């Protein structure tokens, strides 16, 4: 199974375990697919170019048939403000919630969903640029900056620690009772990282 389909499977697993239910019965995997599309469009449109190579790659990897005019429209509706490069994808937040909040006991993915998704973004972006013979330094830098942003959020919750798996298991099995919301928020806030994302995730933990 390739990493994108693995992440779709993880979306289903997180939903099945009650971590998240999106408004309007939108599936988390569909939300992720949209976010991955926006990510690739963002890389392409930084230099204003979107050609047949990019179109073919998106069709193959995500199943969307996106014309140049559609790509421009996606950019205009979602990416004109400077904040896109620092905006954490919604699905990524829920993956962080599942892992850092220990929402799933005996997680079949060993609490590595968020880490896997960040690696998938990186790999997908690298493959996208490799498939485009006209890739520019600007596009490479944009990909690098976006991946750094994702990694900083993982670090913020300790999800890049080499021993994270054992730490998560220890947290789940230390006693039979779940930590209350205040304890969990205190634990998450004790980690260094990005305040805005912590506020979002901490709010979700109380849901």
Please name every model-derived segment.
Residues 1-185:
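Small-residue-enriched hydrophobic alpha-helices in membranes
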Residues 182-207:
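Pre-Walker A (pre-P-loop) alpha-helix and adjacent loop at the N terminus of AAA/AAA+ ATPase modules
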